[in-house]
Regions:
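Conserved hydrophobic register position within alpha-solenoid helical repeats
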Residues: 75, 115, 150-153, 195, ...
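Bacterial Sec signal peptide processing site at the extreme N-terminus
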Residues: 29-54
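Amphipathic alpha-helical scaffolding segments comprising HEAT/armadillo-like alpha-solenoid repeats
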Residues: 49-63, 85-104, 113, 124-140, ...
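Short inter-helical turns and helix N-cap capping residues of alpha-solenoid HEAT/ARM repeat scaffolds
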Residues: 67-68, 107-108, 138-139, 145-146, ...
């Protein structure tokens, strides 16, 4: 009977190859949280026992000195917004510049994704323009990776809920169906589903009309469900994924008077002026 092959990530393998003292130290750290290491980091090729109890480098130091893609991505995810944590305007501008550059230009997809995610959690309005540009620059990667980056940018823009990003989100939803492979069609549908969810953060009639249009014209179940969820978020009403039911709520004046959130349906003319 053949024995099971050794797994380098198993404790007994580590004990044989690193020595029992090192293995014990690793186990102690992982079980008690005394070291800033994860199991993936311990079992990675770059792991060194001598660094076991070494404090992690600050994110800015990593970004200024390291070319390791994984380390840089982790550092980008760890950056905090200076102004929200007692920092100065100068520090804020520096961090925004670092994140924006990574979101738009980094050669590593994971670094772009982490930078975009972090910008989505910032309150700084400058992040919005960077996120929009990150969406458009995602095309430098292969289609599947580009779709992931675009979707992350749309999620981040939805968190900001800034009217400057409304044009991009609606543009994605109004793009014609893709003529191409099944993969290309699915990539574009993933974008549209993400955009429909992001639109739930914009309590504007332009948003509700776009979402209503999805219920009227689209057949994809996931996209229709995303549109319904966003309409529910905007209006506070719970209705089925049905165009007629939502059309009545949004356009019938009597039904609108009974709606719990009367402020969501703004005058379309006013909205048109705001969206320019």
């Amino acid at each position: 009977m053949r024995g099971r092959s050794a797994n380098p990530a198993e404790p007994q393998y580590l004990a044989r190859n690193l020595g029992w003292q090192a293995a014990f130290a690793i186990g102690f750290c992982l079980l008690n949280g005394g070291c800033a290491l994860t199991w993936d980091e311990v079992t990675s090729r770059d792991f060194r026992v001598k660094n076991l109890f070494k404090a992690a480098e600050p994110p800015l130091v990593v970004l200024e000195t390291s070319t390791d893609g994984d380390k840089r991505a982790k550092a980008l995810a760890a950056l905090k917004e200076p102004l929200a944590n007692g920092g100065t305007p100068e520090e804020q501008s520096k961090i925004i510049e670092i994140l924006s550059n990574a979101a738009m230009n980094d050669r590593q997809p994971l670094s772009r994704l982490r930078a975009i995610e972090t910008l989505g959690n910032f309150l700084d309005e400058r992040a919005v323009d960077s996120l929009k540009e990150a969406y458009y620059r995602a095309g430098t990667f292969n289609p599947e990776i580009a779709t992931n980056i675009k979707c992350q940018a749309l999620v981040a823009l939805g968190k900001h809920a800034d009217l400057r990003s409304l044009d991009l989100i609606i543009k994605v939803l109004r793009e014609p169906p893709v003529v191409g492979s099944e993969m290309e069609k699915q990539n574009k549908m993933d974008e549209k589903i993400t955009a429909a969810r992001a639109l739930g953060s914009f309590a504007q009639s332009l948003s509700t009309e776009t979402l209503l249009g999805i219920l009227k014209a689209e057949t994809d179940v996931a996209l229709r469900n995303a549109a319904r969820e966003s309409l529910e978020k905007i209006t506070g009403k719970e209705l089925p994924t049905d165009y007629t039911a939502w059309e009545e709520i949004l356009h019938d004046s009597d039904a609108f008077k009974k709606a719990p959130n009367k402020t969501f349906l703004t005058d379309l003319t006013r909205m048109t002026g705001l969206s320019r």
